[in-house]
UniProtKB/Swiss-Prot annotation:
Induction: By stress conditions e.g. heat shock. InterPro entries: ATPase_NBD, Chaperone_DnaK, Heat_shock_70_CS, HSP70_C_sf, HSP70_peptide-bd_sf, Hsp_70_fam. It comes from the Bacteria. Keywords: ATP-binding, Chaperone, Nucleotide-binding, Phosphoprotein, Stress response. Signal peptide: none annotated. This is Chaperone protein DnaK. Pfam families: HSP70. Residues 603-637 are annotated as: Disordered. Acts as a chaperone. NCBIfam families: PRK00290.1, PRK05183.1, prok_dnaK. GO terms for cellular component: cytosol.
């Protein structure tokens, strides 16, 4: 059995880790970094870039550079948060045929799981390069407050990337695993406050020693899947746009290139202001009007940034309060506070959290890597490499069905430990009703329409009977990934209907299979592209070396030699400009053969010169050696 890797699939950055010889190793990518930007770009020459290379070219290619796609995963196009996102990003968010939010690049519609799969493929390749063997299994993390559709979509992304997703694990739970595995024995309760690039989670977790096992039990979880560092960036970008407009009268919002430069500058300034009190945002030639080029130069203080985002930080406190209440605990019951996610490096966030919980957060947990480390530990638990860990997670939202009058009737309450199974008997609403529709919902509202619809299915052929007589048993079964399976059974006939909840939206099995095939085809295309690039480089190098040899040969090269070589050189240069690898290799061989006689002639002459070196020169060389020895002053060494 191969290694099970742990992947933190983040909104802004992703990270991959593996348990090796009892220690977790965060694996560096091809660029030498331990985290990879979750950015994908499609270039004009048909190449797909992932990570840092994609981020580097974003300024010149904003419409085809996709970032923060995780915020769209498992979401419907008409959701308010999606409509808000459309205003914020330079790329195109469109409505798919099934009503989901997809993206459109170069006229092609793509599902968010398909885009996220590109990041997962990069993580998979990073691990394979390090391990030197294929990797097919992974544990992938999701925000604790992700609903069923979002979890299912993340699992789909893994499949498209060629990974068997052994477990979907909640990010705060993974961070607690990373923190708690090597801590002293004894029970303690921790808060994991996870403010990442696009999502916010808070979990109350009890870490206990039970019969020699580390038991991690999630008591409650809460959050906001559309609140994160991206929103902090947007506040700063809006401020910079307003300041520039006041000064120059120009609104940069209509200029995608300028906005992309501003986005990068705002992100950099935000990071700098975590360690300095003031920074300059300086963008020369950001735009131009009739009077000439315009430069943006704005001083931003830490206090100014804090005033811009204070309400966002405060928005994280209510979920903390709710999670504590759901767990039946007070602030005084919390032993440790763990901060996860890059945005928690902001001093205002740290201060606000410390004030609410009455204690400073721990500083020994790496906020960028803890989640991937925890995922790797969970992977090792599933592989049987780690024996003494038990993870008890919860479902973040209440699950139920729509009943008479458009009411949501809960079957499994939020914060129920998973896996779990619950059955309840319902009946018909009308006399002689022959079928019932089971409408599965997720959320906390009493009105069914206010909750997230996860799917519908019918139980038909119910024998005629007065309303209220038939007994229909509805069973909800949540697996360890937090993914729901629902069945309905007519107790009189034993007839049963069941589904794995595929969101009323979501990708069909056929779509996933097609995307898997596309990904495999792209991998083959990428391999061919790499081989072609390598052949071109070799061809260029051979052209350069051959021209250098002709120059050095001077008169030793006959006109006939030169003509033969020049002809072969011209053919190779033409081949290098084309797309045929076999042609390039053939022309390289031809050039090698054409230049071999001249190379042999030059080599023979050089060897002859070495043998014919005058005796006087050799004697002089010997004299030089003696002089050097004579001049050496050993006492002063």
């Amino acid at each position: 059995m191969g290694k099970i890797i742990g992947i933190d699939l983040g909104t802004t950055n992703s990270c991959v880790a593996i348990l090796e010889n009892g220690n977790v190793k965060v694996i560096e990518n091809a660029e030498g970094a331990r985290t990879t930007p979750s950015i994908i770009a499609y270039t004009n020459d048909g190449e797909t870039l992932v990570g840092q290379p994609a981020k580097r070219q974003a300024v010149t290619n904003p419409q085809n550079t996709l970032y923060a796609v995780k915020r769209l995963i498992g979401r419907r196009f008409e959701e308010n948060v999606v409509q808000k996102d459309i205003q914020m990003v330079p790329y195109s968010i469109v409505k798919a045929d099934n009503g989901d939010a997809w993206v459109e690049v170069k006229g092609q519609k793509m599902a968010p799981p398909q885009i996220s799969a590109e990041v997962l493929k990069k993580m998979k390749k990073t691990a394979e390069d390090y391990l030197g063997e294929p990797v097919t299994e992974a544990v992938i993390t999701v925000p604790a407050y992700f609903n069923d559709s979002q979890r299912q979509a993340t699992k789909d992304a893994g499949r498209i990337a060629g990974l068997d997703v052994k477990r979907i694990i909640n990010e705060p739970t993974a961070a607690a695993l990373a923190y708690g595995l090597d801590k002293a024995k004894g029970d303690h309760t921790v808060i994991v406050y996870d403010l990442g690039g696009g999502t916010f989670d808070v979990s109350v977790i009890e870490i206990a020693e039970v019969d020699g096992e580390h038991q991690f039990e999630v008591l409650a979880t809460n959050g906001d899947t559309f609140l994160g560092g991206e929103d902090f960036d947007i506040r700063l970008i809006d401020y910079l746009v307003d300041e520039f407009k006041k000064e120059s009268g120009i609104n940069l919002k209509g200029d995608p290139l300028a906005m992309q430069r501003l986005k990068e500058a705002a992100e950099k300034a935000k990071i700098e202001l975590s360690s300095t009190q003031q920074t300059d945002v300086n963008l020369p030639y950001v735009t131009a009007d009739a009077s000439g080029p315009k430069h943006l130069n704005v001083k931003v203080s830490r206090a100014k940034l804090e005033s811009l985002v204070e309400d966002l930080v405060q928005r994280t406190i209510e979920p903390c309060r709710t999670a504590l209440k759901d767990a039946g605990l007070d602030v005084s019951d919390i032993h440790e506070v763990i901060l996860v996610g890059g945005q928690t490096r902001m001093p205002l966030v740290q201060k606000t959290v410390a004030e609410f919980f009455g204690k400073e957060a721990r500083k020994d947990v790496n906020p960028d890597e803890a989640v991937a480390v925890g995922a790797a530990i969970q992977g090792a638990v599933l592989a049987g490499d780690v024996k003494d860990v038990l993870l008890l997670d919860v479902t973040p939202l209440t699950l139920g069905i729509e009943t008479l009058g458009g009411v949501m009737t809960g079957l499994i309450e939020k914060n129920t430990t998973i896996p779990t199974k619950k059955s309840q008997v319902f009946s018909t609403a009308d006399d002689n009703q022959g079928a019932v529709t089971i409408h599965v919902l997720q959320g906390e509202r009493k009105q069914a329409a206010q909750n997230k619809s996860l799917g519908k299915f019918d139980l038909a052929d119910i024998p005629p009977a007065p309303r209220g007589v038939p007994q229909i048993e509805v069973t909800f079964d949540i697996d360890a990934n937090g993914i729901l399976h629902v069945s309905a059974k007519d107790k009189a006939t034993g007839k049963q209907q069941s589904i794995v909840i595929k969101a009323s939206s979501g990708l069909s099995e056929d779509e996933i299979q097609q995307m898997v095939r596309d990904a495999e085809a792209n991998a083959e295309e990428d391999r061919k592209f790499e081989e072609l690039a390598a052949a071109r480089n070799q061809g260029d190098a051979l052209v350069h070396a051959t021209r250098k040899m002709i120059t050095e040969a001077g008169d030793k090269a006959t006109a006939e030699d030169k003509a033969t070589i020049e002809k072969a050189l011209g053919e190779l240069e033409a081949a290098v400009k084309g797309d045929d690898k076999a042609e390039i290799e053939a022309k390289m061989n031809a050039l090698s053969q054409a230049s071999t006689p001249l190379a042999q002639k030059m080599y023979a002459e050089q060897a002859q010169q070495g043998e014919d070196a005058p005796q006087g020169e050799q004697a002089k060389a010997a004299d030089d050696v003696v002089d050097a020895e004579f001049e050496e002053v050993k006492d002063n060494k």
